[in-house]
Amino acid sequence: MSRKNKKIKKKVFVDTRYNSRIVAKFANRMMYDGKKSISESILYSSIDLLADKLEESDKMAVFYKALDNIKPLVEVRSRRVGGATYQVPVEVREERREALAMKWIIFAARKSSGRSMKEKLSNELLNAYNSTGAAFKKKEDTHRMAEANKAFTHYRW
């Protein structure tokens, strides 16, 4: 029996504008130095910009579809067996899929040059919605890596 205690998950509250837990998590992940109001305003304005670009009435449907297009199904994890390290493909839990998708979108938006953060984020969300861009490329690379190491799936734990 395991002696470790189960990790207590922090409760993430829903955001005020869209009443969504995922939007609140996204804002928290974007935040620098505890400045949540700034990260929320950037996120809200980029969602508005995204909806204007697509001329969509349902902003949240667009946001969720963009996030779903980036969520990875599998990833590789290192496993050491007999002196050799293998990259073993494993399925990703839903919670981690969300976290990785958010992380990749934010990283891709921050990495792109010029313009303000709200414009960069809305462009990256648009690219994610259209299944293109740096975040989508990261997902594809992860899937390609898992596909290449499919032979080592029997090392799963």
From Swiss-Prot:
GO biological process terms on file: translation
Superkingdom as given in the UniProt entry: Bacteria
What GO cellular component entries does it have? Answer: small ribosomal subunit
For molecular function, the Gene Ontology terms on record are:
rRNA binding; structural constituent of ribosome; tRNA binding
Keyword vocabulary terms for this entry: Ribonucleoprotein, Ribosomal protein, RNA-binding, rRNA-binding, tRNA-binding
Record-linked InterPro entries: Ribosomal_uS7, Ribosomal_uS7_bac/org-type, Ribosomal_uS7_CS, Ribosomal_uS7_dom, Ribosomal_uS7_dom_sf
The record, for Pfam families, names: Ribosomal_S7 (PF00177)
Entry's family note: Belongs to the universal ribosomal protein uS7 family.
Function field: One of the primary rRNA binding proteins, it binds directly to 16S rRNA where it nucleates assembly of the head domain of the 30S subunit. Is located at the subunit interface close to the decoding center, probably blocks exit of the E-site tRNA.
What binding partners and quaternary form does the record give?
Answer: Part of the 30S ribosomal subunit. Contacts proteins S9 and S11.
Which protein, by its recorded name, is this? Small ribosomal subunit protein uS7
Q: Which gene encodes it?
A: rpsG
